[in-house]
Amino acid sequence: MKKIFLLQILLILSIFSFAQVNLQSLVKPGTKLIYAVETNEQKYDLIITVKALAPAVVFDWEMTDRANNNGTITHTPQAMISANTMYNYFVPGPKTLDDNTLCVWLSKNIFAGLMKPGKGIMMKMNIGDVPKKMGTYAEDNEELKILVNGEKETVEEELAKELNGEGTPVGNDVFFTFNNSAKMPVILRMRNDFYIVLKEIKTK
């Protein structure tokens, strides 16, 4: 009887705890990805509204730091395959990125290179930056706590940092994490000259 009661308690607790979610099944046209941003002692939200996923990602964006700070990012199909440069500094209005540049998403080539622990892949953290060898180095996956339509969930994330020649992290604070899915390689957190973290997903 005590065992049954304990099992019931554990089941109840599990309902109120964070459950892991699959972003590939969640992120569709119309989905909103809401990121918390910290930069220059400012805090605000970056709201990404997905418009298309194929043949390339297109999304509207809005920042809540001031009025009319919004636009649209369009990627090329080639960029989704092989781009190695991140576009992090948004300019209001429509913007079509070139074949070498991606925003919020990772290319298939970058994802594949990052998923080889200790090996890394050369990429630019910002337009105009010198390429850095970024890579994963630990097998223990982390989990990011988020809200999905108001419900507590977790997302499995992979941590990437700049690596030295031996395949171990160099001593700086630059990093990003990404969703552990080749079909939905979305940036979850990033620290560069700013800090950004996915905090909520809305599908309705």
Q: What residue spans do the PLM features occupy?
A:
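Sec-dependent N-terminal signal peptides
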Residues: 4-17
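Acidic, serine/threonine-rich low-complexity disordered tracts
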Residues: 21-105, 109, 113-204
